[in-house]
């Protein structure tokens, strides 16, 4: 493939997540998705904001933020939309949202401009029970105060076969 020059280069922007705790801040990067969920099997309550505008107090198993490349991975399995990788977007997909008289959470994914900042603030009682999953790798942080997710300015170069067609592959694998 490489020796025969039978490839194209696709540039993609990963997600950048800034995990802020009472003690420090750590940046993480994901090509596919960042998932915020509970360490144990219990409902999380999260304050969700987009560009500093409150969306809602979310209650459910967690929240998944994906890139267009990641839209066909865990995001799709969680009920999110498949996004054409040529589009400059972020996707926010709820995981098992609660909808009761006491809790109202959105039930479908939200597609946002890649210029958006997604802020997630856990209720104080959940600050030590959150698992951050980055492209399948699990991370635990103590005393999380907030999590901010943006499209990174970094560019990754993916080698693709010259005959790679996104929608053909989607139709073969998923539809």
Residue positions per predicted region:
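A generic structural signal for short beta-strands and their flanking turns/coil linkers
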Residues: 11-15, 30-32, 42-46, 61-63, ...
């Amino acid at each position: 493939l490489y020796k025969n020059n039978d490839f194209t280069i696709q540039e993609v922007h990963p997600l950048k997540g800034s995990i802020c705790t009472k003690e420090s801040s750590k940046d993480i990067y994901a090509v596919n998705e960042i998932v915020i969920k509970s360490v144990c099997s219990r409902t999380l309550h999260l304050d969700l904001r987009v560009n500093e505008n409150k969306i809602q107090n979310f209650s459910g198993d967690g929240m998944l933020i994906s890139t267009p490349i990641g839209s066909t991975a865990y995001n799709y399995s969680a009920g999110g939309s498949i996004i054409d990788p040529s589009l400059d977007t972020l996707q926010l997909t709820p995981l098992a949202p609660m909808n009761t008289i006491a809790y109202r959470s959105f039930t479908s994914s939200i597609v946002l401009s890649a210029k958006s900042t997604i802020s997630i603030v856990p209720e104080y009682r959940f600050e030590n029970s959150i698992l951050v999953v980055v492209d399948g790798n699990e991370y635990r942080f103590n005393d999380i105060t907030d999590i901010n997710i943006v499209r990174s300015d970094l560019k990754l170069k993916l080698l693709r076969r010259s005959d790679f067609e996104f929608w053909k592959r989607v139709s073969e694998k998923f539809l």
